[in-house]
Amino acid sequence: MRSPIHHVSPGSAAASAAAFAFTLVALAALPAAAAPIHTSYLWHMHQPIYWPDRSTWYGVPYETAYETITLDHSQSDVFTVFNSDDRVHDYQDYPKTALGMLGDLPDAGAQVSFAGSLIQNVTSLGNAGWNGGRYAANWYQPYRDAMGWTTSGGRRRLDPVIVGFHHPINPLVDDAVFRRMIQAQKAIMPGTWGSPTLSNGFFPAEMCFSERMIPALAAEGIQWAIVPDIHIARACADYPYNANQDNCDPPNPADQSNPAQGYFYAQSISRGVTTKVPVPYGLRPHRARYVDPGTGVATSIVVVPAANGMSWNEGYGSYGTGELDAIASRNDPAKPMLVLFAHDGDNAWQGGYSYYNENVTQFSHAAAAKGYEPTTIEEYLADHPVASDDVVHVEDGGWVNADGDFGSPQFINWNWPLVNGSGQFDIPNGWAEDERNWAVLTAATNRVLTAEQIAGAPVMSRVVDPTQSGTTAVERAWHHLLAGHESGTM
């Protein structure tokens, strides 16, 4: 029998309101440990290296934004990218402005993933005083200020979570490349944010996740990662797949090891897809585990589901509490839901003045007024630790945002199969730009790893900046190889 799906509609508003009112009454009778729905944000900031060839000015490294703009090297309009009024503020002060309006909410905050390539680009513009000083030499100071603000539990209100330095599609890259991406990001963050304490969290580019990443994440000291809620949902035994709604492959039955949930909250979003998530199960943190098939050794981390449907709606227009109200009656106060709005922080409406200066504070205060709890992921996990036996399976895949992919477990937006001249799949004889790119990267990775085995491991600060004295050929090779894995070129 198909699982019941709840669609938001005007006709259900009265029922939802009644259910919500009942929930509030019930919550009032619960002991003090009972908790409401929590909310938080992840703002993702990224721009690539637009001209990853060797620098004309400096010879050894790739070009960063100031040189690329000055020499007009890229086919992209890099000047306009960085001269956008909103991006000038996104990369300097909008997050601080938004969080500065939430100081009366004791635990309210956000996470930001600021890719290393973007740090290098903005630093190049700030140091050069580009375009009349659009970016300050200390452009990072407002971020540092906000990272110094703390919740009631003493945790950062703005948590700079780790992200792959060059925004790779992590499940598709070699494990060694994946770890070097994380290590490069860890190398550039302290000098940028002025704090020796690295975040415990990880945001995967395009939210592309696979449990195969878990051993590398754990080895790099990462305790939790953000994942798409839909890939916990699709791994449930009774996921209500519908090709016209999902717009991607059906789940593999071998992936559907999560218990049947019986109820899925459905949202049809303007991206052209319907997300269906079991609540509360699909909107609260769990653990995910990878078992090495060769050794049987299990490694686990906490996975924090991002609310894909709600994130899309929250990022593209004024957003109230209606979608929280619709699911509030299903919250488990002992294991409360964490509704995480995770999306780009520098594109579309979600990167603009109204979003940061109006919507964040309006929503957060409206949510608090209704009894919901704005928080940060670190604060939530401290207040509501995930049990060691609370383990879910997370299906491979990314967020629903990528056009033509919609969370495909094959990552087809970056991994389109080989086709012939008629567009039919032809693996032995066909062509696909992405697949040929991966072939080149695989060969290059093999050469760099072989060189590393001969010459020794790199110093990551010199991989990030190979103009430093003592930089080796292996470090220069890693510098350029990592840039070649940028998702925007795939």
Set out the residue ranges of the language-model regions.
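CE4/NodB-like, metal-dependent polysaccharide N-deacetylase domain
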Residues: 178-206, 293-295, 326-342
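Active-site and substrate-binding clefts of carbohydrate-active enzymes
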Residues: 36-94, 117, 243-278, 282-309, ...
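Bacterial N-terminal signal peptides
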Residues: 16-29
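N-terminal catalytic cores of secreted or lumenal carbohydrate-active enzymes
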Residues: 35-175
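Acidic, His- and aromatic-enriched active-site or binding-groove loops in soluble protein domains
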Residues: 130-153, 158-159, 195, 218-286
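Sec/Tat signal peptide C-region and signal peptidase I cleavage site
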Residues: 30-34
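Short, solvent-exposed turn/loop segments enriched in Gly/Ser/Thr/Pro and often Arg
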Residues: 113-118, 164, 200-210, 230, ...
